[in-house]
Swiss-Prot record:
UniProt organism field: Danio rerio (Zebrafish)
Protein name: Glycolipid transfer protein
Domain of life: Eukaryota
Location(s), subcellular: Cytoplasm
Keyword field: Cytoplasm, Lipid transport, Repeat, Transport
Biological function: Accelerates the intermembrane transfer of various glycolipids. Catalyzes the transfer of various glycosphingolipids between membranes but does not catalyze the transfer of phospholipids. May be involved in the intracellular translocation of glucosylceramides.
Binding sites annotated in the UniProt record for beta-D-galactosyl-(1->4)-beta-D-glucosyl-(1<->1)-N-[(9Z)-octadecenoyl]-sphing-4-enine: 48-55, 140, 207
Gene: gltp
A GO cellular component entry from the record: cytosol
Amino acid sequence: MALLMEHQFRQLPADKQVETRPFLEAVSHLPPFFDCLGSAVFSPIKADIAGNITKIKAVYDSNPTRFKTLQQILEAEKEMHGAEWPKVGATLALMWLKRGLRFIQVLLQSLVDGDKDDNNPNLIKVNVTKAYEMALKKYHGWIVQKLFQAALYAAPYRSDFLRALSKGREVKDEECLDKVRQFLVNFTATNDAIYEMYTKMNADLDYKV
């Protein structure tokens, strides 16, 4: 699990405020996760995540003191953009980023939970399907949904996927999954806090692409 464990997310403080700089540092290492899935069809999610990180970073870099937390960014943009908010700026970028992170979160949690197709236990199609349906499907139009259905048939074997997460090293599946569990603790808490923030601030949008 070296790919993810080398760049852990921070434990959240009691008030669940997500600090912008360490968050951006941690998420910047996540796009290569999609290379582990093997299919180029997943590259749009990878590109979307990378692009949204860049947009959020640009806003943060413009005033690191003012934008110390993600909530401070949303609050400032709400005041700045008025009726255009939340359809603009880092607020919109983070909205889509959290969905990409939820895809990763659900996929990894599904593997840890042992979800599998009893007829094909070494395929991760079940896990990828669950992640897509829970995180992204409702925001995709018919054409994009069909593209991802095609990608499912190119999903790698479970053993190959875990090996890719371990950067090609031969490690036991259970050893890799133990590290996935460790990674998920702060990663899940962080993304859940972002979802909660969007709900409280009424900043989520449900349009399709």
